[in-house]
Amino acid sequence: MSSTQTTAAEPIMTDNVALRAYYESWDSRVVYQIIMGGTQHFGYWDKDTYWPFPLGSKLRRSMEQKLMEILALPKGSRVLDAGCGVGHVARYMAQHGMRVFGIDIIDWAIEDARKAAKDAGLSKEMMSVEKMDYHHLDSLASESFDGVYTMQAFGHAVDPQKAMAGFFRVVRPGGRIAMVEVERKTAAKHDDPNDRLTQELKMVNDYTVMPTNEAASEDYFKNLLEEAGFVDVVVRDWQPNILPILRLFYSLVMIPYLFFRLFGNEKSFINMICARSGYAGRSRWRFVAITATKAGEKLEDHKSK
């Protein structure tokens, strides 16, 4: 496999001010740290339960294990974590034999991800993290990765077609892509604009800067992958497997939500609205895990490489 080469020029960055503001807000940092232990993705439960504890094993092991299973690459594979956040997924992948190159645009998250790698004793060959925008992968060599994955990060894409074309270019033939993301069950245009839940779901996507979440409906990701050139697309519905954490978040925020709504300032706490509307509106969206392949021979084990 070719090395992950970069050009001398600095990677192009989209100055997404709103996205940076969301992740740098005290609301987001406190919620993710206190409730999620820093992890920025849902957990995975094999069976529904009203007692989802302990959260850590479901957040940092079960979901990451499921992602690794569906990515289905041999140990030693070089993978791109597009939108790596604080690096918990990348760390898990590296600890289980992958060589991970994580990219993100949020400065504090990049520093946390690097610290996570260092604290885990991972070499830069096993896990490295750089500031880079997944819409602009021109500084990465073509066919330099065995796979790419996103974990609840592609919803932030402002140009999903461009980002997907970049993923396709950097993945070698036979390589894989796995995406764990959110899509609507029906297009937004079919929702009643005067319905409060409709308004809150749109507010969440707007305030958390997730235009692709707002646009995505059934077959959206399948079509996006196929248009980019990927084949053998498989879409899995994992929403039943995240219900325990959706229900937990809902139970934690309902009393403060009603209080702040009484005074008309609930919009100041967007993660609270996200937790409320996510569970209340769960019949309107799906949590999907999508995989696809770039046509070519199946990748071999990298033990000898």
Curated annotation (Swiss-Prot):
Gene Ontology CC entries for this record: endoplasmic reticulum
Required cofactor(s): S-adenosyl-L-methionine
Main EC class the enzyme belongs to: transferase
Transmembrane segments: none
EC number: 2.1.-.-
GO molecular function, one term: sterol 24-C-methyltransferase activity
Family annotation (Gene3D superfamilies): Vaccinia Virus protein VP39 (3.40.50.150)
InterPro entries: Erg6_SMT_methyltransf, Methyltransf_11, SAM-dependent_MTases_sf
One Pfam family in the UniProt entry: Methyltransf_11
Pathway linked to the protein: Mycotoxin biosynthesis
Substrates-to-products reaction catalysed: 3-[(2E,4E,8S,10E,12Z)-4,8-dimethyltetradeca-2,4,10,12-tetraenoyl]-4-hydroxy-5-(4-hydroxyphenyl)-1,2-dihydropyridin-2-one = ilicicolin H
Stated family: Belongs to the class I-like SAM-binding methyltransferase superfamily. Erg6/SMT family.
Entry protein name: S-adenosyl-L-methionine-dependent Diels-Alderase iliD
